[in-house]
C-alpha cells in the first residue's frame, strides 16, 4: 500500500491571473481582520487580568502559555511552519500579558547575551528585560521584588551544569517557576569584518570551550582571553579592531559588528537549559517536572536506597547531579529532576519516604516541562 499522507493539501484560492496590486489589496484586507481579532483577543486578556488581580492570582502562568503554544502550532496546515506559528503567538501572548500587568524579568549578562536571547524567546518583546552583572544578582532582584521573575542558565548539553546556579538554588528562598531551552549558535564577530585583523579572541569560558576545535583550526596563533560573558566580549570587539568576539548573532546589531564566521560551535546539537525563578511555585499543568536537593550520610549503597521511593511510585527521574558540600570535604548534595508535580499524591509520598533518611532535603520547585 503506498505511503499516502493524511494531511490535507493546502492550495491557494487566489487566481494566478491576479496582479500584484490586486493580491496586495487582499493582503491588506486580511491584515485589517487580523488586527481587529488581535484587539478582540487583547480585550479578553485584559478582562482575565482584572479577574486575576481581584483574586491575587499570578499573571504569568507558564503552563497555560505552553498549552496555547502547543495548540496553535498544531492548528496550522501550512504554508507557515509550526515553529513560525509558535514564534508569532509568543509575541501575541507577550503583548496580551503586558495588558494584564507589566512583567519585569531579570537576566544574567548584558544585552545580546544568550540568557538575554532566552528571556526574549520565553517572555517576548513586551516584557521589560533587566540585565544583571551576575547570576547572584538575578536572584537578588527577584527576592527584593525589583523583578517579577529571573532567568538563569542551569546546564549546557556539551559543557554540563552551571554549578553557581545550583549553589544559589540551595541558598535562596526562590522557587523554580519554569524552564526554557535555547539552541546555541556561536559566531565570530569583529568590528572591521576582516579575519586578518584579529589577534585576540575573547569570550565566556564556556563559549570558548564549545568552539575549541574551530579556534585551533583557524586561529592557532591567536591570544585567547576569557571574559565574564559573550556580550562583554562583543563590547570589547566593538572598540578594538584586533579583537574577535565569540558571541550571539544578536550582538552583531547591538554592538555594530560584522560576522566573520557563523555557527562555529564544535557540536551542532548545542542546547542550553535555563531556569525561571520566582517567589511562588507554579501551579500544576499536567506535564510537570520537580527539582529537589538532598544530602545523606556517606554509606555503601546509600544513593541506590534513596532512589527506591521514586521507583516504587513509578516516577521517572530525568536528571541526577552531585555537588560537594561547602566546608565538608568528601560529602555531597544530590540534585534530582523528575517528572511530576509536588502537589501530586504519589510525588508527595515519594518525597516523604526520601526525607526519612536525609540529613537535608529541599524542594526547589515544580514547574511545566519546557518546550
Task: Show where each model-derived region lies.
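Domain-level signature for soluble enzymes in the chorismate/prephenate branch of the shikimate pathway
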Residues: 1-371
Amino acid at each position: 500500500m503506498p505511503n499516502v499522507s493524511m494531511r490535507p493539501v493546502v492550495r491557494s484560492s487566489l487566481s494566478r491571473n491576479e496582479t500584484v496590486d490586486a493580491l496586495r489589496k487582499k493582503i491588506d484586507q486580511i491584515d485589517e481582520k487580523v488586527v481587529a481579532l488581535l484587539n478582540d483577543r487583547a480585550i479578553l486578556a485584559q478582562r482575565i487580568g482584572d479577574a486575576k488581580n481581584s483574586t491575587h492570582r499570578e499573571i504569568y502562568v507558564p503552563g497555560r502559555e505552553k498549552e496555547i503554544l502547543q495548540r496553535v502550532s498544531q492548528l496550522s496546515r501550512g504554508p507557515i511552519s509550526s515553529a513560525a506559528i509558535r514564534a508569532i503567538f509568543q509575541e501575541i501572548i507577550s503583548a496580551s500579558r503586558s495588558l494584564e500587568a507589566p512583567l519585569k524579568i531579570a537576566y544574567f549578562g548584558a544585552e545580546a547575551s544568550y540568557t538575554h536571547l532566552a528571556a526574549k524567546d520565553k517572555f517576548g518583546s513586551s516584557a521589560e528585560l533587566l540585565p544583571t552583572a551576575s547570576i547572584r544578582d538575578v536572584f537578588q532582584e527577584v527576592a527584593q521584588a525589583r523583578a517579577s521573575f529571573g532567568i538563569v542558565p542551569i546546564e549546557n548539553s556539551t559543557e554540563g551544569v552551571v554549578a553557581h546556579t545550583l549553589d544559589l538554588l540551595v541558598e535562596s528562598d526562590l522557587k523554580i517557576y519554569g524552564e526554557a531551552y535555547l539552541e546555541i549558535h556561536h559566531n565570530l564577530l569583529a568590528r572591521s569584518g576582516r579575519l586578518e585583523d584579529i589577534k585576540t579572541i575573547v569570550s565566556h569560558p564556556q563559549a570558548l570551550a564549545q568552539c575549541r576545535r574551530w579556534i585551533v583550526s583557524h586561529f592557532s596563533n591567536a591570544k585567547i582571553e576569557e571574559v565574564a560573558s559573550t556580550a562583554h566580549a562583543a563590547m570589547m570587539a566593538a572598540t578594538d579592531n584586533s579583537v574577535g568576539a565569540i558571541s550571539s548573532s544578536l550582538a552583531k546589531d547591538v554592538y555594530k559588528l560584522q560576522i566573520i564566521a557563523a555557527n562555529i560551535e564544535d557540536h551542532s546539537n548545542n542546547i542550553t537549559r535555563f531556569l525561571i525563578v520566582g517567589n511562588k511555585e507554579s501551579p500544576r499543568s499536567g506535564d510537570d517536572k520537580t527539582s529537589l536537593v538532598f544530602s545523606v550520610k556517606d554509606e555503601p549503597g546509600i544513593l541506590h536506597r534513596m532512589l527506591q521511593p521514586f521507583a516504587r511510585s513509578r516516577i521517572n527521574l530525568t536528571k541526577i547531579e552531585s555537588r560537594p558540600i561547602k566546608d565538608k570535604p568528601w560529602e555531597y548534595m544530590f540534585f534530582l529532576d523528575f517528572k511530576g508535580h509536588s502537589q501530586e499524591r504519589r510525588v508527595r509520598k515519594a518525597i516523604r519516604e526520601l526525607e526519612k533518611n536525609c540529613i537535608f532535603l529541599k524542594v526547589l520547585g515544580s514547574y511545566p516541562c519546557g518546550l
